[in-house]
Amino acid sequence: MKASELRGKDAAGLNQELSELLKAQFSLRMQKATQQLQNTSQLKKVRKDIARVQTVLTEKANAK
């Protein structure tokens, strides 16, 4: 997911995306804890995506 794609969305869409990413992160953490996670790089990707969404939300809030 690119920041340029995120900037095209409105705040409600970004909040929904953030909620989905947080659920995915929780799920991945639980899989890691129970040693069921095969691809651990997914954790890093989701964490970076969460940061991107939060950054764009902050940019939109400060622009007002």
Curated annotation (Swiss-Prot):
GO molecular function: structural constituent of ribosome
Keyword terms of this UniProt record: Ribonucleoprotein, Ribosomal protein
Pfam families per record: Ribosomal_L29
Gene3D superfamilies: 1.10.287.310
InterPro entries from the UniProt entry: Ribosomal_protein_uL29, Ribosomal_uL29, Ribosomal_uL29_CS, Ribosomal_uL29_sf
Top-level taxon of origin: Bacteria
A GO CC term assigned to this protein in UniProt: cytosolic large ribosomal subunit
Family: Belongs to the universal ribosomal protein uL29 family.
Descriptive protein name: Large ribosomal subunit protein uL29
Gene symbol of the encoding locus: rpmC
